[in-house]
From Swiss-Prot:
Cofactor(s) demanded: pyridoxal 5'-phosphate
Any one biological process term the GO annotation gives: L-histidine biosynthetic process
Protein name: Histidinol-phosphate aminotransferase
Keyword check for Transferase: yes
Gene3D superfamilies the UniProt entry points to: Aspartate Aminotransferase, domain 1 (3.90.1150.10), Type I PLP-dependent aspartate aminotransferase-like (Major domain) (3.40.640.10)
NCBIfam families on file: hisC
SUBUNIT field: Homodimer.
Gene that encodes it: hisC
Lineage: Bacteria, Pseudomonadati, Pseudomonadota, Gammaproteobacteria, Enterobacterales
Source domain of life: Bacteria
Organism name: Klebsiella pneumoniae subsp. pneumoniae (strain ATCC 700721 / MGH 78578)
Catalysed reactions listed for this entry: L-histidinol phosphate + 2-oxoglutarate = 3-(imidazol-4-yl)-2-oxopropyl phosphate + L-glutamate
Chain positions with N6-(pyridoxal phosphate)lysine modification: 211
Amino acid sequence: MSIEDLARANVRALTPYQSARRLGGKGDVWLNANEFPTAVAFQLTEQTLNRYPEPQPKAVIESYARYAEVKPEQVLVSRGADEGIELLIRAFCEPGEDAVLYCPPTYGMYSVSAETIGVECRTVPTLADWQLDLPGIEARLDGVKVVFVCSPNNPTGQIIDPQSMRDLLEMTRGKAIVVADEAYIEFCPQATLAGWLSDYPHLVVLRTLSKAFALAGLRCGFTLANAEVINVLLKVIAPYPLSTPVADIAAQALSPEGIAAMRQRVAQILDERRYLVEQLRGIACVEQVFDSETNYVLARITASSAVFKSLWDQGIILRDQNKQPSLSGCLRITIGTRAESQRVIDALTAENV
């Protein structure tokens, strides 16, 4: 019997999540992972590396609670928001019995986490405007324990209609957990659902320091939920999810000075997004640029696969979305520096397709 044969059957059938880093490339313009384009400097202040870290670092929890305007007991910190996704499925879904539901085109880790754990994935594609198909969701809710909704949605960039979210929360009350993935909420803070926690005991909000806080390499995320949900998740999370250096840097990022710096970065990205969108809409091979509330834009490109490869060969790495439902011909472009935007603009302008 081979090692492969010893693995669980569902694991043998898995295809690993195709992250930007896994897909690789040898570019010098990296616009495929929705990262902040330049590094932010931090100094380590904690020198107690001979001791295990706090299971849930108090300074980080309290700082994030103040920032998100929730109570500390409503905050769980984890190794990125991706760990929060996995914890929710592990805690609330029985493998082989329960299901999760999500609405493509959307973030790929919902399915990867569920499939790894052995939980059924159900999909209800979004409508033509990428909003929720509420009747379709209601028809498929039987046996569903967790519903994932990404807002703003990755990769399409739009906010999910708040009334649709309220309708979904009423529809699932007493039946399922509803997870609002707000990885990109700093770019449209008015759209957060964190203030709804008191109204909906089954609402969970996922957050991260990877995007606007410019700390993708830190792997630090947050789950916001009512204390009853947090207490369930504390039963399944690893004892020390954040190393001491990670907690140290996260606390600095969440200081008043750190939050002010983040908001300056957001303003910078929004300015650059306006410039890039304006320029893209004047390029011959760009058929459509969709409105975005995030640090990336989705564009439909003539001969997109060939254009993607052409830019790849020039060292400009974008994210091909052709395999996502309803996104034929689409490429996703992270907002970078002005120089990086200009590289994309010049390369697309030169395409003869």
